[in-house]
Amino acid sequence: MINTIIIQKNLLLLFLLGVSLNSFGDINRYIRYTQNNLSSYGVIIDNKVHQLTKAPYLGGVKTGKTANLDKIILLAPAEPSKVIAVGYNYHSHRGDMELPAHPPIFLKLPTSIIATNESIIYPNGATDVHYEAELVVVMGKTASKVSKEDAENYIFGVTAGNDVSERNWQANDLQWFRGKAADTFAPLGPEIVTGLNYKDLLVQSRLNGKIMQSQRTQDHIHDIDAIVSHISQTVTLFPGDVIYTGTPGSTTAMVPGDIIEIEVEGVGILRNTISK
């Protein structure tokens, strides 16, 4: 019941604030949810969930069925074929390292994804698990070899993500895969929002209520259009694929019992508990 009340308050607040947000156009909020053991996509209108025929990034339309927010459980808002991430995309996180000509890219897995209110699980042998607050891009069209100038036309919307990372594995393994792609290491949500000006949104993390990271996406080293274009030169992006676009500042380890919140301006709060 507490989680349901939090969901209602967050979604209502976003609805009320929507008219004042810096946007590219009409702002729409899409979720994926379960009700009576059936999963669906939906759009939030007037504080009600309107069920869609399929994922909004696949052209889903309203079925005519609605649900109350207190009768649903939120799921991760996308079901991607690929979970791609960008490293060192803020000067505040990169420090004095030499700037790369292109965005450094790595992969997480669809099995890394969890929804808001689910638990981030420490893998066996993990000792130093960190949060990373990030804006996440959700693709809306198949993109292959697109230009930077055209990239925004392939983006459906944005959401919040946590690029959870095991720092010891990240530092000592030959590749980042184990330290980045473990189960539950890609919290995503709570919703996909279209129409936001993703080039200038505030990204924050809070650990047990304390602000740990806070910076705007306008400070990206490689902007989102450049990231989408660069990835699409070698990898075909499909609707629903997600791209974690980098984290600001420094991070610290999380321990079981901690609550980590990732908030992206206009998107809402992604909240997860740490568990063994």
Give residue ranges: language-model regions:
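Bacterial N-terminal signal peptides that target proteins for export
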Residues: 1-12
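N-terminal non-catalytic cap/leader segment that marks the start of a structured domain
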Residues: 25-103, 196, 206, 210, ...
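A generic local secondary-structure boundary/capping motif
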Residues: 73-75, 94-96, 120-129, 143-150, ...
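Residue-level recognition of short, solvent-exposed, well-ordered loop/turn junctions
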Residues: 79, 85, 115, 130-132, ...
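Structural signature of FAD isoalloxazine-binding scaffolds in flavoprotein oxidoreductases
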Residues: 99-116, 131, 261-265
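Catalytic-pocket segment enriched in acidic/His residues
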Residues: 167-276
